Regions:
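RNA-binding accessory domains that recognize and position tRNA/RNA substrates
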Residues: 1-179
């Protein structure tokens, strides 16, 4: 597993240092939140309700069953702005997995940091609520340091995840419309 120094910087001042399995070349902005599920990271990351959020998973190891095809996803891509895990398995052991969590994030241009104390991060979020955050390479501290955190509440997230045209999911005897 490759180790590129990376960090999560919270608007409240805390900095959590870890590593990325791939090079992070820019700053990624989002709202730091946590998820306590033991399984279902593909469903969580593709869930449109996580759009613009940097998701910290509290379960100790993530990625152990890899990523399956899109049929099990909540949408057609990763919606989260970033992924934070304590320990990352890069060699998934599941018959139906098509790739690792790390390769999926890299292909999707979504930053992934491992080696962070997600319990400590969860306590900060629990005590202060969801907080604006930046993911960046640790060696990029002196360059391009943007102190302008993004307020996710000022973005029209619903418009970004909604379909703009009707979508036919399946044909059949009855016509069902979802609005």
């Amino acid at each position: 597993l490759l180790k590129y120094p990376a960090q999560l910087r919270l608007q409240s001042g805390e900095v959590f240092s870890g590593f990325s399995p791939f090079k992070i070349n820019k700053q990624y902005f989002g709202e730091a939140v946590f998820n306590t599920g033991m399984v279902g990271y593909t469903e969580t990351l593709t869930d449109p309700s996580y759009l613009g959020q940097i998701v910290s998973f509290t379960y100790p190891i993530m990625g152990n069953y890899g990523v399956t095809d899109k049929s099990t996803w909540e949408s057609d891509k990763i919606q989260a702005a970033g992924v934070i895990v304590s320990s990352l398995c890069n060699d998934p052991k599941r018959e139906f997995s098509s790739k690792s969590l790390a390769s999926w994030c890299e292909e999707s241009n979504v930053p992934l940091i491992y080696g962070i104390d997600t319990r400590a991060l969860t306590k900060v979020i629990r005590d202060n609520g969801a907080v604006s955050a930046i993911i960046e390479a640790s060696d990029n501290l002196g360059n391009n340091k943007n102190k302008n955190f993004i307020d996710i509440n000022q973005q029209d997230l619903v418009k970004q995840v909604c379909v703009s045209e009707p979508k036919i999911v399946k044909t059949g005897k009855y016509k069902i419309i979802v609005v």
